[in-house]
């Protein structure tokens, strides 16, 4: 993998692969090559345009990003643009069933859970993304081995890396 992407040798539950991606230009690196993953975005989004954030989300959706948790200044906007990218990709189909309108989504991207963690510590948001943010019980995801991808701007990289490599510390600081 390129220098931007580091596969961490971490002891994670269920043998989950853990990738650390440098988010220097807000672009999804093609070399990541994963499907069905949880993403954690730790960034200061104040300098990123709406189009840039939406482009990142749009690039991640075809890789079947199942969950995205955002942390850092202006993380609510990151959350909103991921939601927008999902809702408009692809166009939902509506059908009437048992007297109620239902919406179904493409099997390519059946579900996306998004959260933002404004006002929380980095450790708390990372713990949530790592241990809670996976759509368990959903048939599309039940039998899939999850991958955890942390997309991190340089100022937060070392702390995120250290926490991901030390699950006990992540739990201790994340639950504090």
Positions of the model-derived regions?
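ATP-dependent carboxylate-amine ligase
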Residues: 1-176
